UniProtKB/Swiss-Prot annotation:
Homodimer. Belongs to the YbaB/EbfC family. It is found in: Cytoplasm, Nucleoid. One of its GO terms (cellular component) is cytosol. Binds to DNA and alters its conformation. May be involved in regulation of gene expression, nucleoid organization and DNA protection. Pfam families: YbaB_DNA_bd. InterPro entries: YbaB-like_sf, YbaB/EbfC. This is Nucleoid-associated protein PSHAa1202. Residues 1-20, 87-108 are annotated as: Disordered. HAMAP family: DNA_YbaB_EbfC. GO terms for molecular function: DNA binding.
Length: 108
């Protein structure tokens, strides 16, 4: 009886590991758009945190360099936050709401 229970538990752990790997693969290709300055600056970021595109509104070309740099940083930070939110939501679905410790990734 113990062997059957342990075997079932191992099977469930493997299934969860497979689902988490699939979710991680999907997250890596996820695209989010971070914005700053009411959409004047947009940063498109992939789920693996690679920046794919930066868009600047034409009206910014007349503004000073410091403001543009601040808006770019804010848009990047917004994109990073959005990736983190999406990752948490998708992984929560896979783990049934069980929160993994920070930095812990599946598969182990």
């Amino acid at each position: 009886m113990f062997k059957g229970g342990m075997g079932n538990m191992m099977k469930q752990a493997q299934q969860m590991q497979d689902r988490m790997q699939k979710a991680q693969d999907e997250i890596a290709t996820l695209e989010v758009v971070g914005e700053a300055g009411a959409g004047l600056v947009k940063v498109t970021m992939l789920g693996n945190h690679n920046v794919r595109r930066v868009e600047l509104d034409e009206s910014l070309m007349q503004d000073d360099k410091d403001m543009i740099e601040d808006l770019l940083a804010a848009a990047c930070n917004d994109a990073v936050r959005r990736v983190a939110d999406e990752t948490q939501e998708r992984m929560g679905k896979v783990t049934g709401g069980m929160q993994l410790p920070p930095g812990m990734k599946m598969p182990f």
